[in-house]
Amino acid sequence: WGATVITNLMSAIPWIGQDIVEFIWGGFSVNNATLNRFFALHFLLPFVLAALALMHLIAMHDTVGSGNPLGISGNYDRLPFAPYFIFKDLVTIFIFFIVLSIFVFFMPNALGDSENYVMANPMQTPPAIVPEWYLLPFYAILRSI
């Protein structure tokens, strides 16, 4: 459903819609390769968002600083970022990555779903992502464009 909706939505853009669809999916049809690309895209998006958040933090703290949002030149308006908080945050991140590594390396399927091993089938919507009945008219309108 998601790949079909995105495909139809992108193809509705005048002049460049077909090119966008072919760029995203490699073609207009929704088949096994398309669904695998869709799943891979959804795997990568959280990392892209994390990178954008990190870039935002770096840019925010680089010149003006979070304690000086107006850009006032005097240092008396800035609040120093205490080294204690940096150390505390680093310890927390370190512990988080240790726990995450235990799950990833020793129990990789503990937090997974058995449906992850089912081959993608474009003709059958998995029960977990069947759209709600009240969204079906909007999908029908979108498909008719």
From Swiss-Prot:
The chain crosses the membrane at residues 38-58, 85-105. Heme b b566 binds at H56. Binds 2 heme b groups non-covalently. It is found in: Mitochondrion inner membrane. The keyword Thylakoid does not apply. GO terms for molecular function: metal ion binding; ubiquinol-cytochrome-c reductase activity. It comes from the Eukaryota. It is a multi-pass membrane protein. Its cofactor is heme b. Keywords: Electron transport, Heme, Iron, Membrane, Metal-binding, Mitochondrion, Mitochondrion inner membrane, Respiratory chain, Transmembrane, Transmembrane helix, Transport, Ubiquinone. The keyword Lyase does not apply. A ubiquinone binds at H61. GO terms for biological process: mitochondrial electron transport, ubiquinol to cytochrome c. Heme b b562 binds at H42. Heme 1 (or BL or b562) is low-potential and absorbs at about 562 nm, and heme 2 (or BH or b566) is high-potential and absorbs at about 566 nm. Belongs to the cytochrome b family. Fungal cytochrome b-c1 complex contains 10 subunits; 3 respiratory subunits, 2 core proteins and 5 low-molecular weight proteins. Cytochrome b-c1 complex is a homodimer. Component of the ubiquinol-cytochrome c reductase complex (complex III or cytochrome b-c1 complex) that is part of the mitochondrial respiratory chain. The b-c1 complex mediates electron transfer from ubiquinol to cytochrome c. Contributes to the generation of a proton gradient across the mitochondrial membrane that is then used for ATP synthesis. This is Cytochrome b. The gene is cob.
